[in-house]
């Protein structure tokens, strides 16, 4: 397998992996049973926050109380871009860390904007996937440039989403720990989103390498083609050597020169032939028969 094909397939493999992880990350939290119940963003001890459960998990679309036996209970109603804001989720409480009361907007908008960036990143990710597949089918400058541009745009939005989510929930962990409450990040969700970022980095680099290699090959080809045309224009047309005429002379001139020599530089040679009429004739009766033949013999100057 050539170097280019290897880079193409590595690029496509990593891009498909990033697309799969992003879809799974968005679907995570859609159900609070089965495997998806373990895909959450944040878990903390919320006992004493008015009517909040003792332990709460925040998912993509809702939050749920979490029991020690591994069952989600008392879940909130589902909604897209469920914000992380204990004050909005449970109401104000004196036992709640003060940062959630004083800096409510920071947590609220970090979580919601992070979700929006994730959806925008998924949109550009699908465009990137289509453009990369198109460049594999028929590679040209436009498809390669589109795939590269979409790869970097997708990387920007997915990375921005990962940073917003990480910043939001890392601040929340610090706030809960400051109040001696247990809190932790969801390892599976953050593992998925940062793995997606890594795959997209590799994809963007591969697309850039392919475009750079393609442009370099076109530049080398253009220069070699231009130099070949220059040499061909300066070199006379080779003509086979015929009759001592230089090979650089056109064929028509050679034919005209030979025709000219045939008319002016040939002489006629006569040869004499003796024949004996009969074997018994005497020498004095030998008859000489003059037979003249004409031959065109070229004269060597």
UniProtKB/Swiss-Prot annotation:
Cytoplasmic topological domain residue ranges: 27-112, 165-191
Transmembrane segment boundaries: 6-26, 113-133, 144-164, 192-212
Region (Disordered): 254-301
Xref: Pfam families: SUR7
Compositional bias segments (type: Basic residues): 261-275
Gene Ontology BP, a term: endocytosis
UniProt name for this protein: Uncharacterized plasma membrane protein YNL194C
Primary localization: membrane
Annotated keywords: Cell membrane, Membrane, Transmembrane, Transmembrane helix
